[in-house]
Amino acid sequence: MDWNELEKIRLAKVEAMRSEDIEPYPTRSEVDQTIKTAIIAFEDFEKQSEPSINAPQAILAGRIRSKRVMGKLAFCHIEDSSGRLQLMLRVNEIGQGGLKEFDERFDLGDFIQAGGSLMRSRTGEITLLVSEYKMLAKAITPLPAAKDEIVDGKVVHHATLSDPETRYRQRYADLAVNDEARNIFRTRTAIIRALQRFLDKHDFIEVETPILQPIYGGAAARPFSTFHNQLHQELFLRISFELYLKRLLVGGFDRVYEIGRDFRNEGVSFKHNPEFTQLEFYMAYADYEKIMGLTEQMLATVCDEVLGKRTFIFDGQEINMDIPWRRVELRQGILEATGVDIYAYPDAEALYQAMQKAGLNPKEGQPRGKLIDSLIGDFLEPNCIQPTFLYDYPRDISPLAKNKPGNPQIVERFEGFVGGMELCNAFTELNDPLEQEKRFAEMGRTYDADDEENHPMDEDYLQAMSFGMPPSGGFGMGIDRLTMLLTGNRSIREVILFPYLRDIESEE
């Protein structure tokens, strides 16, 4: 590695410590509790009517986040994943040599172990009065930037990082210095756990299905492909869990769900990442109406558990997740927004001409399904700020959904929108193997062989359906987008620990 001048200074400290047989990266620590636990123990000690003579003792560890040395006294703040605490180092306890060593060898970003007794400083801050300490890990590279803060009349230097590109590329540094970033991912974890609790409570079982698949399906997207050398077989990273989860319905599991990664070889945007986390569940003997109700309950419960309320601010607007959500029939919604009645134009060319006449600037040469998708994305989705279900979709764009009784051109499908973006997608599942085979064939004829919307024929899935699949409802939702909403972030990169980024060399 090429080291800059500041890093060379820290490397010299590493060499100096080792020359004195002091290991800057020891194998073990003697930590006996977290910072949060120590603070709680001290607060309990203070509440005692007749406190014991000796204050609580603790051996703590953390990253040094601030540091100041003043004559025979030094202060620093350390931080672990549970909280932050001030350390006080005095000549009385550690000697002049100990204070000198701390001053000269410890820098912001270093991990320190400190033992001593808990107390309150003159300003009332809970503090560990250090009687012994040691280096746990020397940080050679300084934390990315610095800001100053006045504490007790003294200037304290704190590490921070704000440049978005650097934060995404060096997420480890971002997490090390930004509380806000860590809180986003704590919230993300809380969201996933709340979803699991809700589904478990409703008798769903969590399962795992293949990530490497011989045939991709369950969504309209271009897959990533790979090759198994020993089997001489092309494989695909899954774009959806759907077809495998529905095989489990055939096998007798009436309520199943999976939370995991999907991979789609498509564009990157503020709300799209090629690798993303998805929740899908399937429920036997349910239809899309029942799934709508379950969706409302589930997301209201998640808000209650994660936020403690059902309202939050997203993109400057207050969103209210109370039940029930607004419901808009898709045909009527498009008609009111654009003046185009999509069911009056049963083929792509007729719909294209109608959109042209209405001044909607459609893209030429698109299948009818893609034209309808563009109407939804351009004219309905941005206006669905409060939770909204768009329902009853054309069969053209829903090859796995069941027809609405009495209308073979419409399927029982809904999409949920919140904050002006799609959050979830669900439908009454098609369980007729003959109709499903016909739909797969139609998709193959409608789109070119290399089109991303082309849905390959999955013979094994059809075989599974032929054994009998119960009537059911299915649901899919992006965990990343839900996290965006509940943390108030407009960019998906903010809620994925290591988002996809273009190589720096290719940018140059």
Language-model segments: which ranges?
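Class II aminoacyl-tRNA synthetase catalytic cores and aaRS-like
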Residues: M1-E508
